[in-house]
Amino acid sequence: MSNASPLLRSSNWSSSTTGLLIRHHHLSVPLDRSGQGDLAPDGSDSITVYAREVSAAGIEPLSRPPLVFLQGGPGCEAPRPSADAGLSWLGAILEHYRVILIDQRGTGASSPVDRPDAAGSPAATARLLTHLRADEIVEDCEDLRSALGLERWSLLGQSFGGFCVTRYLSEHAESLETVYITGGLPAVGHSIDEVYALSYEAMRAKSEEYYDRYPKDRDRMSHLSELAGRGELTTAGGDIVGTERLRSLGALLGGAGGADALHHLLERDPDSWTFRYDLGHSLAFGGRSPHYAVIHESCWADAGTTDWAAQRARPAVFEDDPTLLTGEHVRRESFAEDTGLRPWLAVADLLAAHEWPALYDPTRLKATTTPGAAAVYARDVFVPITTSLETAALIPGLRTWITSEYEHDGSRASGGKVFNRLRDLAAGMISR
């Protein structure tokens, strides 16, 4: 192992089975950057952040400038390059950069917090999870940049990763060469309730659009809702799926091919094993990354508490029509129904009452000169277009491309076309 810093352990470059060159970084960073003195589960004041640096083969790896990819979520690790991972978008980036894939703190190989009793009690684990937001993720990135001896680097943020990019611009714009954001501009200056009012309206419209395309599915969804209301709808694993959790199938509509995937699911017999198996794997939240549900609302909290905002802010029209679908709207009862989330409920309750600090400084954002480009998806049901454009207008060097061609996952689904468009836009090669 070679060391660029006493706190950094870096491997040598090696070839991977995908034909890429890869090296691994492990960096020790402070857990608590807020000064409250919180400690890691092992009693230390530090955690480890892992990053995988990737370069195209056949070149000197350091010959291309560095770009950090910040993953969506929150609570999800960076993607792992593999032959069947659908990472054609990564290939497009590697034509111009070497890419650093960071597992954000608490995920993947970065001191993962993967059990509700990780810190010994719900209260202690909740305290631990308060340190997994964009503010401290950005400071981890800064520590890694410094440890690698880099003066500047570029960023690409997808969804929540774009929130991290915005925080980075707010705090350390001088460290950034160029920034790219895909479906991920936060709602600076807006409350979480305002955000959910917009996303619920987007999901109402998306639901109606879906039923216009597949009219029979409204009756199918109504029947499933009746079964769910009687406690008769279950996954193959035996979890009871209530009416509200059933609605979360609407999250499928936020990605490429999601409408067809939902339609194919609803065509199946609700009593069949295949339906119940696919249902369990299609529901939003839970599963492999419980953090996605547990800390989800915190990513929208630019100060204040969240207090189960998605549950509080839901419009009356959703109460009247059980066939209207929801998206990234976490409801408390979903924790009670999902065996994977149930142990996290006490932690989630504590986080819902936590007083979150502000994340963004509009004055500093307005003073930045970093060039960049953002893809704003007109049909995005997860990140509202109106607040996205308001935030983009605060950042002088950020050019926006508004498109209805892609859903929220356009960066991945386009196979690199979105990134190439943003690169040309940021460089001034195209105007929009």
Question: Model-flagged regions — what are they?
Answer:
Residues 4-8, 12-236, 359, 363-364, ...:
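Gly/Pro-rich cap/lid or specificity-loop segments adjacent to the active site
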Residues 29, 376-377:
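Short glycine-centered, acidic/aromatic-flanked micro-motifs in structured strand/loop junctions
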Residues 75-76, 343-348, 374:
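Short, basic, glycine/proline-bearing loop/turn elements
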Residues 176, 395-398:
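Core-facing hydrophobic residues within beta-strands of well-ordered domains
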Residues 231-357:
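Alpha/beta-hydrolase fold active-site neighborhood
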Residues 258-261, 381-387:
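Conserved alpha/beta-hydrolase "acid-adjacent" motif
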Residues 265-267, 384-393:
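Short alpha-helix in the alpha/beta-hydrolase fold that links the catalytic acid
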Residues 368, 373-376:
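Short beta-strand/loop motif that positions the catalytic acidic residue
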